[in-house]
Amino acid sequence: LQLSYRPRVMIMAVMFVFCINKGYDIY
């Protein structure tokens, strides 16, 4: 895997997981 390939994808993935965790905490 190339970390410098698309950092935006990694950031979006982290944000997605973070939002999912927040959603589970809320619900």
UniProtKB/Swiss-Prot annotation:
It comes from Fragaria ananassa (Strawberry). It comes from the Eukaryota. In developing fruit, and to a lesser extent in vegetative tissues. This is Uncharacterized protein RJ21.
